[in-house]
Amino acid sequence: LIDEGVTALDALALPADESGLARWYEQIEEVFAGSWAEIEGRLDAAGEFGAKVRELTAQASPSALVAAAELFHANATQDLAGSLDNERVLGELMRGEPDFAEGVRAVLVDKDQAPSFAPQPSPEKYREVLK
């Protein structure tokens, strides 16, 4: 393999399957914009796609969902340095949230996979630290 160099990969590579996300591209573009509250509202009207997103986020921390939506919104107008700084400051804030410790407990400590997260917070607390 070493003698063949990168061309050895051609003989070993498998054809790529179609992306599982590709079929949802239009719905992703339509649904995932704005605040988490806006996204949730659009999920209700998104049929099978909305049901799948709800299934995949059922055990997610409400604060993480709200914060992620705010981060994406803020970073849409930032350059790379500003986006990375937003990631840093939001990460610092999130690691101090009770939901972070609860998620660690549920997944890594007790391994019961049954977190008891706080109710969905206001997005303002995250907007205050983002550029």
What do the PLM-derived regions correspond to, one by one?
Residues 2-131:
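C-terminal alpha-helix plus adjacent terminal tail
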